[in-house]
From Swiss-Prot:
It comes from Bacillus cereus (strain ATCC 14579 / DSM 31 / CCUG 7414 / JCM 2152 / NBRC 15305 / NCIMB 9373 / NCTC 2599 / NRRL B-3711). It is found in: Cytoplasm. InterPro entries: CodY (IPR014154), GAF-like_dom_sf (IPR029016), GTP_trans_reg_CodY_C (IPR013198), Transc_reg_CodY_N (IPR010312), WH-like_DNA-bd_sf (IPR036388), WH_DNA-bd_sf (IPR036390). DNA-binding global transcriptional regulator which is involved in the adaptive response to starvation and acts by directly or indirectly controlling the expression of numerous genes in response to nutrient availability. During rapid exponential growth, CodY is highly active and represses genes whose products allow adaptation to nutrient depletion. Its main location: cytoplasm. This is Global transcriptional regulator CodY. Homodimer. Homotetramer. May form homodimers under conditions in which energy sources are sufficient (active state) and homotetramers under insufficient nutrient conditions (inactive state). Belongs to the CodY family. The keyword Transcription regulation applies. GO terms for molecular function: DNA binding; DNA-binding transcription factor activity; GTP binding. Disulfide bonds: none annotated. Keywords: Cytoplasm, DNA-binding, GTP-binding, Nucleotide-binding, Phosphoprotein, Repressor, Transcription, Transcription regulation. Modular protein made up of an N-terminal effector binding GAF-type domain and a C-terminal wHTH DNA binding domain, separated by a helical linker. Changing residue 252 to A: Cannot form tetramers.
Amino acid sequence: MELLAKTRKLNALLQSAAGKPVNFREMSDTMCEVIEANVFVVSRRGKLLGYAIHQQIENERMKQMLAERQFPEEYTQSLFNITETSSNLDVNSAYTAFPVENRELFGQGLTTIVPIVGGGERLGTLVLARLGQEFLDDDLILAEYSSTVVGMEILREKAEEIEEEARSKAVVQMAISSLSYSELEAIEHIFEELNGTEGLLVASKIADRVGITRSVIVNALRKLESAGVIESRSLGMKGTYIKVLNDKFLQELAKLKTN
């Protein structure tokens, strides 16, 4: 397959996504096919975002690593020493993707490391490995193109996470601001009693102890539930089951107490 045809194959994957998130596993499979190498997309913290195997490596430690989808911390940190593409590293290199305990079996093993950079920061690393055949310029062009695509995708995911976090926080702040002073006081006591993200409590007991009416507690819970911040369910005489749905809620509640 010529370089142009291989590039088109990668482009076809992006075009088929049509604005939807690119699946790192599919991306790895395509890279594996066009570069003909084992492909590992590794995050900053060593999480295996995607991988594809072209040549099986029979090694228990490697199998466990793939099953856990996590690269060793020491190896992951060492990858940050590589700031530009390093190709055809042999099995004696500290950056080899082949198991060092079986060097004699993988004497022809070659590894190529491609930093994944986006927005001016290191986002991860693309690790390629194969036996025997050197990585040529065409392979490196495809690898660097792929790392750029992966970097853009990681940045997009990060932006979505930030947006979602801001949205969750805004929902919580609006829900809390809708509570009256007595309702807010009731909620503070409820979650003090709950001491976690979910549990069972008896509203009447809290009402008696704090000196507020039960209806204040009911109204406060209803407001939070309608905002999608919590879920509550009456269990009759046993009390009310409450579960926090928005992970920003307890953080914002804690801030109010400290202010």
